Amino acid sequence: SIETKTNIPFMDSISIKLNSKLSFENFVVGSSNQMPFAASKRMTQNQLSSYNPLYIHGNVGMGKTHLLNAIAIELKQKHPNLKTVFMSAERFMYQFIRAIRSKDTIKFKDQFRSLDVLIIDDIQFIGGKESTQEEFFYTFNDLINQGKQIIISSNKSPFELLDLDEKLKSRLGGGLVVDFLPTNFELRMNILNKKVNQIKLDIPY
C-alpha cells in the first residue's frame, strides 16, 4: 500500500488506505470507460480545478473506486504537498456524527475545509440523511469557493439520486459528470486477463 507523504494525523486517520494495485497503469481501458478514465487522468496532470467537481457514476463493479484510488495515488506522488483525503461518504457521515457527539463540530469543519483535494466514494450513501447532507453541502461550497478540488463517485448521476437535497444535486452536477457505459465482451475479457496476470505475479514460485 502507499502511505501519505503529508504527516497530518487527521488525514491519516480518515483516509482510505490506498491500494497500489488500483493504479492508472492497472486500469483496463475500453470504449465503455474511456471518458471516466480520461477525465480522472487529466485531473492529476496539472489540471486541478479545470472542472470542479469531477463526478463519476456507474453500476457496481465498473471501476469507480479503482479510478478514485488511482487519482489519490497520482496526486500523492506528483503533488505530495497537497492535503488530499480519499474517503467513503459513509466515513464522512461517521466522522460528522462523532464530532456532534463530542461537541467538536468546529474542529471537524476546520479540518475538512483546510483540504486541497477531497475525494468521496459512494456519495449516494448520504441520501436521506439530512444533517449529513447539509454539512457536506457547506463543506463542498467552502472548498469550491477556495478553488480546491472535489472528486465524487456514485452509482447514479446526481440528478437521479432521489434522497438527495435538490441544492446538493445541483452542486454535484455543476462540474463535469462522466459515466461508465455497459461493458462489452472484449473489455470484460481484457479485464479478466489482466486480473489473471496479476494473480500469477502475486503467487510466489
Where do the PLM segments sit?
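Conserved catalytic/switch belt of AAA+ P-loop NTPases
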Residues: 128, 133-156, 166-171
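Conserved AAA+ ATPase "SRH/arginine-finger" region at the nucleotide-binding site
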Residues: 160-162, 175-187
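Pre-Walker A (pre-P-loop) alpha-helix and adjacent loop at the N terminus of AAA/AAA+ ATPase modules
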Residues: 14-54, 73
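Short regulatory helix/loop adjacent to the ATP-binding pocket of P-loop NTPases
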Residues: 97-101, 156-174
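Structural recognition of the conserved hydrophobic beta-strand(s) that form the central parallel beta-sheet
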Residues: 86-87, 119-121, 149-155
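Walker A/P-loop nucleotide-binding motif
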Residues: 48-69
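Conserved C-terminal "switch" segment of AAA+ ATPases
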Residues: 182-205
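Short glycine-rich substrate-engagement loop in P-loop NTPases that contacts/grips substrate
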Residues: 76, 81-117, 127-130
